[in-house]
Amino acid sequence: VAAAIVLILVVLFVYGAATNPAYGWSTYGKYLFDSRILVGAGYTLLLTVLAMVIAVILGVLLAIMRLSPNVVLRSVSWVYLWIFRGTPVYVQLVFWGLFPSIYKRIDLGIPFVVQFAHLNMQDLYSAFLFAMIGLALNESAYMAEIVRAGVSSVGEGQTEASIALGMSWSQTMRRTVLPQAMRVIIPPTGNEVISMLKTTSLVVAVPFTGELFGVQADISGVNFQPIPLLMVASTWYLAVTSVLMVGQFYLERYYSRGASRQLTGRQLKAMAAAQNKVLAVDEESDERR
């Protein structure tokens, strides 16, 4: 009964959406593969990839600092995570958009001794660059916690064995702990990639309007039809997210190998054959006696 009710509700919703002129399906079809929308989707993917690459690298470094025996490194990492996890990403992106106004000029050199060069931030301003930096720095704080959880999942015996073999702390992390921690790190990282794809819609706060959400907003601002344009953007977000979810599924299955005690059919047959051999040997021994 419950399934029938749900099915009826779904059919009614689909029928209502298909016949509702407010959705503007003709406009939706017109702009679904518009060149501007495709370029915006490309910028969305580019922002996602670049921001995640930087975030993963910084996240690993921050996690190592957090787990380091050095008090200064641990403190710096903790403060970084406190700031970037404790403030909304939208607010951070607004600050990055105002960065050239806060720091009009950056001097490079040895403080109070010599200056090698200076950078005029207003001349170097790039909305795409600051959007990428803002997303990456925010995400790196979450990646640091994911990496730290993965490292903590590795048994202490592994670390003790590496130290007994004469490895330093950094060698132990690089050669022993991190490779084993990947099984725990990879699945949530896939979730973060999908989340990052959707978070790129917030870079209008910088403001950068070249990505998918910004492009649809520009187009709907001209033709005054925001609903079909939002449907276009949602379709592309769903399409890319679906592809990423499929990739995440296979990646999780790959890294979960050996984590489960469930045997394959081939392994069960081999075990049965081995048991039969043992039984046959036992029977022969009994007959000889």
PLM regions: where:
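Transmembrane alpha-helices and adjacent helix-loop boundaries
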Residues: V1-R289
